[in-house]
Amino acid sequence: MEFWGVEVKVGQTVTVDPMDPVDSYIHISQVALGEAKKDKPNEPVVLYLKVGEQKIVLGTLSRDGIPHLSLDLVLDSDSELSHTSKSASVFFCGYKVLTGNDNASDFSDSSEEDEELALEGQDNGKPELKAEGAKVTKPSKSIPKIGAPAKAADPKKDEDDDSDDESDDDLAGEDESGSSDEMDDDSNSEEESDGDDEETPAKKVDQGKKRPNESAAKTPISAKKAKTATPEKTDGKKSVHVATPHPSKKGGKTPNSTKGQTPNSAGQLSCASCKKSFTNEAGLQQHKKAKHGGQ
């Protein structure tokens, strides 16, 4: 490819031969009007192209309005360029492309070279891993050898560990049972104290005869006793008060609700004044303070 241009003077015609000196074609991309004398009037200039017997109008130029014009014209055979200007030349320009065998071989060689360069660029862009130069990073911790025999597990040590675990479980079970018994005793004493506190104002009302209806005062007390205590028969002995556990007293441990509660193994305690029986000393003391003024 090379630059091409031609000047068509006033009153002349220029013949264009794309095949001279070698096979090629001409691409006309622009045409412009040359300088003219000032005293000459502004006249329109018509551009012509003659191919064989056919004459084609390419466009019209004017010095003040359209001094140049863009074209997209390809000439591959003999042609003639002309114009109608009487005061200025017209310039045609573009480029010439060779189409001969030599040019084709040049283009093929250049394309092959471009392909080789592209392939080399792809190879260079990829990192090559060499087996000889590659180094494996060593781990910070030592790796045990494959051939080294593994140590046999000691059966005696395993048996000792199992026995220790069983003993820990037994101790934990005893602690839970002890804590549940303590919670049962506390709940018994609290329920008895609540019952005594409710009975005391009821009796005072009866003594002062402030309320004639005695059944109305005693009704809520018996209802509460029916809910909180359940009598149990034990071999001809007196009925024993069995308390319902209160799990909300201690947040850390919850008593076993399914486990039945038994009376105190030390025996029953009875009040000397009213002959009421209690399962522990704390309940008896609270009863004396509430019913008999601490006697």
Curated annotation (Swiss-Prot):
Entries under Pfam families matching the protein: NPL
Subcellular location: Nucleus, Nucleolus
GO cellular component: nucleolus
Main location: nucleus
The family this protein is said to belong to: Belongs to the histone deacetylase HD2 family.
The organism's taxonomic lineage, starting at the top: Eukaryota, Viridiplantae, Streptophyta, Embryophyta, Tracheophyta
UniProt-recorded name of the protein: Histone deacetylase HDT1
Acidic residues composition bias: residue spans: 109-118, 159-199
Keywords: Chromatin regulator, Hydrolase, Metal-binding, Nucleus, Phosphoprotein, Repressor, Transcription, Transcription regulation, Zinc, Zinc-finger
GO molecular function, one term: hydrolase activity
Sequence segments annotated as region (Disordered): 105-271
Chain ranges of zinc fingers (C2H2-type): 269-292
GO BP, one annotated term: chromatin organization
InterPro entries: NPL, Znf_C2H2_type
Gene3D superfamilies: Nucleoplasmin core domain
Main function: Mediates the deacetylation of lysine residues on the N-terminal part of the core histones (H2A, H2B, H3 and H4). Histone deacetylation gives a tag for epigenetic repression and plays an important role in transcriptional regulation, cell cycle progression and developmental events.
Bias kind Polar residues: ranges: 254-271
Regions of compositional bias (Basic and acidic residues) in chain numbering: 123-135, 200-213
Top-level taxon: Eukaryota
